[in-house]
Amino acid sequence: MKLIIFTGLILFPIVSLIEAQAKNEKACLPQYQVCTDAPGNCCSNLICDCYGRYKNGARIGRNCFCLQKGVLYKKEN
């Protein structure tokens, strides 16, 4: 019985450490990927840039994409 409790006490911190490392090492989102639900997950050289969508002057939604820092995007005709 003591061996089971001791084993559990040893395994719990090891499993917790592995899970914490996996969360810290999650893959970042590359350029042009949607980041609406995960704004902090863009790779280090990118930012999550959001744009509102409008129809007849009323806002109908929002789109966010991982884009290069410092780059301006303009609508082309």
Curated annotation (Swiss-Prot):
Record's GO cellular component terms: extracellular region
Protein family: Belongs to the neurotoxin 19 (CSTX) family. 08 (U8-Lctx) subfamily.
Keyword Iron: no
InterPro entries in UniProt: Spider_toxin_CSTX_knottin (IPR019553)
Leader sequence residues: 1-20
Keywords: Disulfide bond, Secreted, Signal, Toxin
Propeptide residue span(s): 21-26
Protein name per Swiss-Prot or TrEMBL: U8-lycotoxin-Ls1k
Post-translational modification: Contains 4 disulfide bonds.
Expression (tissue specificity): Expressed by the venom gland.
Subcellular location: Secreted
GO terms of molecular function: toxin activity
